[in-house]
Amino acid sequence: MDGIYDVTTLTADQYMVVSGFLSMGFAAMLATTIYLYLAQARVLPKYRQAIVISGTVTLIALYHYWRIYDSFKSAHAGGEVFNEAYRYVDWLLTVPLLLMETIAVLALPAANRKSLTARLVPASAAMIILGYPGEVSADMATKAIWGGLSSIPFLYILYVLFVELTKTLESQPSEVAATVKRLRLLLIATWGVYPISYLLP
């Protein structure tokens, strides 16, 4: 079988566990998408764009993880290759949107929003594209090379989100400044997991 993920080796119990988690993910993403679109009217106008983006992210993820599950079933039955690209196609769309959502929810001045969007969206796309060749390679040297290249825009994104946002704290209302401080720490904690998981076999 092509690729580095041979799902035909899964036991019946392992297959059921993966299927169950994917099913739970479908339900969660569908419910979240519906809720977010219906909740727009109850959100302040300046935050509605962030809500729409959030709903779009979960809708895109719902579609791609359904495709992952469909490929997973076909590959497990034998005769077809498990399509490893669906996750990266999903991330290529959703990660830039998540960054746009982060910028939108902070309610920064228009000039700041445009500047951050222009820098972060291309960097996030480069990070995903550069990471894919290493993800699908079983060779650790190849994985390390592409992982290193992907880390350049990854670190740039963290730099912009942490350092550049820090520069705006003094000019922001106290409630916005507090949100930015918490967000910086959350981003470091959550995004820091990705390089570790990328290098795992």
Predicted regions located by residue number:
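Hydrophobic transmembrane alpha-helical segments in integral membrane proteins
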Residues: 2-29
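Short aromatic-rich membrane-water interface segments that cap or initiate transmembrane helices
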Residues: 12-17, 78-92
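Hydrophobic alpha-helical transmembrane segments of multi-pass membrane proteins
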Residues: 28, 50-70, 192-199
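Alpha-helical transmembrane segments in multipass membrane proteins, preferentially the mid-helix core
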Residues: 31-35, 101, 130, 153-174, ...
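Internal transmembrane alpha-helix with an interfacial aromatic "cap," most often the third helix
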Residues: 33-36, 88-121, 125-136
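Membrane-interface helix-boundary motifs at transmembrane edges
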Residues: 38-50, 106-115, 139, 168-178
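Helix-loop junctions on the outward
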Residues: 61-87, 129, 133-138
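Membrane-helix boundary/juxtamembrane motif in polytopic membrane proteins
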Residues: 114-119, 144, 165-189
